[in-house]
């Protein structure tokens, strides 16, 4: 019984870590994308003479 409990806790902790890492990487990707978008806007503005 206690062995199953420990195993379950380990699995839950692992799942939590995976979810946190996935969310973090998605957040970083979106931040990167927004930054690239801003840079593209700047380049477009310079090319169009703004």
Swiss-Prot record:
It comes from the Viruses. This is Uncharacterized protein 030R. It comes from Frog virus 3 (isolate Goorha).
